[in-house]
């Protein structure tokens, strides 16, 4: 009998690019940007032309994974489309990429460092007007 580890499916390898490479891919190569932060985080500032599909929701019990995440992404992107995925620090977006790759999305890239690194580099963002 073959060892059981030979039958395990290893998770797809997530390709992570730094924020400078991500900016180039979005600005010059025309890749679309998927922001997986919460709607509240996204509303405080985001990359221009980004699409927001939260990977997690904040509930009274803490963070809970969005059960419709892959379905919602599939309504916005084709499985062949090249997409840069980002969050606040690069952790949720990496998990999101794992789920998307497992669902058959072929060309997703994680933005390492996330929105925080984007801001640290002084790259352009869309900040909604503050009320009050």
Put a short name on every predicted segment.
Residues 35:
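Conserved P-loop
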Residues 1-31, 39-84, 91-132:
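Rhodanese-like catalytic fold shared by cysteine-dependent sulfurtransferases
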């Amino acid at each position: 009998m073959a060892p059981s580890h030979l039958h395990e499916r290893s998770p797809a390898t997530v390709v992570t690019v730094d924020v400078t490479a991500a900016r180039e891919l979005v600005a010059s190569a025309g890749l679309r940007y998927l922001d997986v932060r919460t709607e509240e985080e996204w509303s405080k500032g985001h990359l221009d032309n980004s699409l927001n599909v939260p990977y997690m929701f904040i509930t009274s019990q803490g963070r809970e994974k969005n059960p419709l995440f892959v379905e919602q992404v599939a309504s916005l992107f084709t499985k062949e489309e090249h997409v840069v995925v980002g969050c606040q620090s690069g952790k949720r977006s990496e998990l999101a990429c794992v789920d998307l790759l497992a669902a058959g999305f072929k060309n997703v890239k994680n933005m390492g460092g996330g929105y925080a690194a984007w801001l640290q580099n002084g790259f352009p963002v869309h900040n909604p007007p503050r009320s009050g």
